[in-house]
UniProtKB/Swiss-Prot annotation:
The keyword Transferase does not apply. The keyword S-adenosyl-L-methionine does not apply. Keywords: Lipoyl. Residues 19-101 form the Lipoyl-binding domain. It holds the Pfam family GCV_H. This is Glycine cleavage system H protein. Belongs to the GcvH family. One of its GO terms (biological process) is glycine decarboxylation via glycine cleavage system. It comes from Dinoroseobacter shibae (strain DSM 16493 / NCIMB 14021 / DFL 12).
Amino acid sequence: MPTTYYTDDHEWIEVEDDTATIGITKHAAEQLGEVVFIELQPEGETFVKGDEIGVVESVKAASDIFAPVTGEILEANAALVETPAELNEDPEGNSWLYKIKLSDPGELSELLDAEGYAALIG
């Protein structure tokens, strides 16, 4: 069964075995407003925790996406790049950004659980 974690940067990461799906939270999507552009890295790219791995631009602001963990991109959500406004419709579901292979599962212990994230956003 997948386990979901959250970051201080308003990203979620759903982990099952050594694979994780990454996206931005509903709270972040609401704060951004209507998303008009998304830039994602290609499959096969590797990154370390904290690296910039994408950009989400809205009518209000641009926001960098930072890697919540170290890994390799298995899949980028190409459909979301084509229709960025979909991110506002289902940010914590079908509008995920990446599927990745985890390099260091130990990094997950540094992330927030649902209760911790709820406390963060008040």
